[in-house]
């Protein structure tokens, strides 16, 4: 009986170990990150087309050997564009398994999403209502970093080595005729090698592939020992360890057709009549191992559940421990700014001063030192660290670190050489440096930055303080949205919020926010519209403008010019006729759509970016703006009834001088 029991137990144990082995062989793809935007109804035609597309992508075996496949389903506004891209060194079977898993994962991670991009180590899958896969300049990005930093003494040499390796990889991938995939390895030292991998979707031309990869490489922060950057049309990655199949002379070796069999454990032979003893010996060896495995799994699961619960219960906006790896020592910051010398002072923000600094590795930074006497500063400080640490976009200022010691609260940002937009925009001596081409580029960059906050980042973020002073310009006059102290994070399904404490800058605030504390993505859209009018005119919204014996702010003034058929009277005289008439009128039109009083009438940032980049898109007729100052001879028509409600409180929003 005991032998029978032992054999039963041995059978169950063998089954258990076999199950573990099968599970290991069928391991899920390694998740990296995803972007999910624009929820849609499950009852819509678009959603039905999406389900058909996902099924088609994951079931057509003919394309897995190519490693990539694109499809469209539906027509007109219900059309869905879809694509998958498997890593260039992946076997067709592994590619198939990853795509099937991704299609299923899509339905759980982004139920009802109109645009989605998910990345695994093995493959990428995405879909959208527009062809984002052939667009080499997109706001849909996934960026990840290795948490380990390069030592200061090795930083410059490391950066140069990685950049050189990535560029060579990009050239090789672009010139590839098939998968547009390349991997390279170089020796950084006698004991350390660097590894790089780049890939474009096969449908891109060589020129577009190079352009896409060059842009992605620019976004990588090489002071980390590893990182990757993904957009729908290309991706790049570097590490200090091999993460791809070994290569010979730059050619990727094909993976084996099937995995080699696991080595079998040889069973010792026993003399006849010793069967019982052999069973006991096998059990004595295997049982403790199996029990140890079970205990380890149980302990790991227990701690994992505790961590998950802790993460769920902790308010995200007050938790800066996740950014702990970004923390600077106060002495380092003090030395970098020469003890916060007035010679290094760049300006003053709402809660403190901003200084220029130079870190020990030679990197120039902007140091924002919050005032010690600011009662509101600590909350905004923690908020800014948590929000900005998770953002990676070319049109958003990069947070490099922070310092929180005793009473000191300091934020360390990348140094942007050309100061802020208002420095050029509202100074008659500097305005000439902003021709219309530059201003148009700035408008587009700001729009893409805000779109990333609203739609393409992992969090939905409302900036709440968008203004010319919070737009920094780099050496090439590219805009970077800054100052996230007022920003708020929205939940996935949240569309608006209320606050009793209205913060921000009067003149840029939307009516519903200034008067009722209600804010949403459309609040940022309103601020963006005001900012566009300032960029076009070179004038501040807070100033007073006289027209037909009546006064108003810049928004009101623009509306009257538009109504009178003379919108070009708004244009900054510093660039006179050096602009395209239709282009600038279209920008004024878009700005007026943004500042409409009814939030439902204001376009989304996604629509605004499309309006700016596609001249064929028809624009709606703008309605009167919020805070509309109506002159005595203007009558409130059907579209103006609601505007009159705002004129009562207008003086509390834009400071008026007595008449």
From Swiss-Prot:
Q: Which reaction does it catalyse?
A: L-seryl-[protein] + ATP = O-phospho-L-seryl-[protein] + ADP + H(+); L-threonyl-[protein] + ATP = O-phospho-L-threonyl-[protein] + ADP + H(+)
Quote the cellular component terms of the Gene Ontology held in the record. membrane
Extracellular side residue ranges read: 25-279
Query: According to the record, what induces this protein's expression?
Result: By salicylic acid (SA) or by a bacterial pathogen infection. May be regulated by WRKY DNA-binding proteins at the transcriptional level.
Kindly give the membrane topology term recorded for this protein.
Answer: Single-pass membrane protein
Query: Which coarse location class describes where this protein primarily resides?
Result: membrane
The cellular location(s) given in this protein's UniProt record come to: Membrane
Which positions does the record annotate as the modified residue Phosphotyrosine?
A: 413, 513
Q: Does the keyword Signal apply?
A: yes
Instruction: Cite the Gnk2-homologous domain residue spans from the record.
Output: 28-132, 138-243
Binding partners and assembly = Interacts with CRKIP1 (KAPP), CRKIP2 and CRKIP3, three kinase-associated type 2C proteins.
Name the chain's protein: Cysteine-rich receptor-like protein kinase 5
The species is: Arabidopsis thaliana
Which lineage do the record's taxonomy fields give for this organism? Eukaryota, Viridiplantae, Streptophyta, Embryophyta, Tracheophyta
Name the gene for this chain. Answer: CRK5
């Amino acid at each position: 009986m005991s032998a029978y029991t032992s054999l039963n137990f041995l059978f169950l144990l063998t089954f258990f170990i076999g199950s573990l082995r099968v599970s290991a062989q069928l391991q899920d793809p390694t998740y990296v990150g995803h972007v999910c935007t624009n929820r849609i109804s499950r009852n819509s035609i678009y959603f039905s087309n999406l389900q058909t597309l996902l099924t088609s992508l994951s079931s057509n075996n003919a394309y897995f050997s190519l490693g990539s496949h694109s499809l469209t389903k539906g027509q007109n506004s219900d059309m869905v564009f879809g694509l998958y891209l498997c890593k260039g060194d992946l076997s067709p079977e592994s590619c198939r398994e990853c795509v099937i898993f991704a299609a299923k994962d899509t339905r759980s991670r982004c139920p009802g999403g109109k645009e989605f991009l998910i990345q695994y180590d093995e493959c990428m899958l995405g879909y959208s209502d527009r062809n984002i896969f052939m667009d080499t300049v997109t706001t849909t990005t996934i960026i990840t970093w290795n948490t380990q930093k390069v030592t200061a003494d090795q930083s410059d040499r490391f950066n140069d080595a990685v950049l050189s390796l990535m560029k060579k990889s990009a050239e090789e991938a672009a010139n590839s005729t098939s998968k547009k995939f390349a991997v390279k390895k170089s020796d950084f030292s006698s004991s350390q090698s660097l590894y790089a991998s780049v890939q474009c979707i096969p449908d891109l031309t060589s020129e577009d592939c190079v352009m896409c990869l060059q842009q992605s490489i620019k976004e990588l922060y090489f002071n980390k020992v590893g990182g990757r950057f993904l957009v729908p049309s290309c991706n790049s990655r570097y590490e200090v360890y091999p993460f791809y199949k070994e290569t010979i002379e730059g050619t990727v070796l094909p993976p084996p057709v099937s995995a080699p069999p696991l080595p079998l454990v040889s069973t010792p032979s026993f003399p006849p009549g010793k069967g019982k003893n052999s069973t006991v010996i096998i059990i004595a060896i295997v049982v403790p191992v199996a029990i140890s495995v079970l205990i380890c799994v149980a302990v790991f699961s227990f701690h994992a559940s505790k961590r998950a619960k802790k993460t769920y219960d902790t308010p995200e906006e007050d938790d800066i421990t996740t950014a702990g790896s970004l923390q600077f020592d106060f002495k380092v910051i003090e030395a970098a700014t020469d003890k916060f010398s007035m010679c290094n002072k760049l300006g003053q923000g709402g809660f403190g001063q901003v200084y220029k600094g130079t870190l020990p590795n030679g990197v120039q930074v902007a140091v924002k030192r919050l005032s010690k006497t600011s009662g509101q500063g600590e909350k905004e400080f923690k908020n800014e660290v948590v929000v900005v640490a998770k953002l990676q976009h070319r049109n958003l200022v990069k947070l490099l670190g922070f310092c929180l010691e005793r009473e000191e609260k300091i934020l360390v940002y990348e140094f942007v050489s050309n100061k802020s937009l208002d420095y050029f925009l509202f100074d008659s001596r500097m305005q000439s440096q902003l021709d219309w081409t530059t201003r148009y580029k700035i408008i587009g960059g700001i729009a893409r930055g805000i779109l990333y906050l609203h739609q393409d980042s992992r969090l939905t973020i409302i900036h709440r303080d968008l203004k010319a002073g919070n737009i920094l310009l780099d050496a090439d006059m590219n805009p970077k949205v800054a100052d996230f102290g007022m920003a708020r994070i929205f939940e996935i399904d949240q569309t608006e919020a209320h606050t009793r404490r209205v913060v921000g800058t009067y003149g840029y605030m939307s009516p519903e926010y200034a008067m009722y504390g209600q804010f949403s993505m459309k609040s940022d859209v309103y601020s963006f519209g005001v900012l566009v009018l300032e960029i076009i005119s070179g004038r501040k919204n807070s100033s007073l403008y006289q027209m037909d014996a009546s006064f108003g702010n810049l928004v009101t003034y623009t509306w009257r010019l538009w109504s009178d058929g003379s919108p070009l009277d708004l244009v900054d005289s510093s660039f006179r006729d050096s602009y395209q008439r239709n282009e600038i009128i279209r920008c004024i039109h878009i700005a007026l759509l943004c500042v409409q009083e009814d939030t439902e009438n204001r376009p989304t940032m996604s629509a605004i970016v499309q309006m700016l980049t596609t001249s064929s898109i028809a624009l709606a007729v703008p309605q009167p703006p919020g805070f509309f100052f109506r002159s005595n001879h203007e009558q409130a028509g059907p579209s103006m009834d609601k505007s009159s409600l705002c004129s009562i409180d207008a003086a509390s929003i834009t400071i008026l001088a007595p008449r």
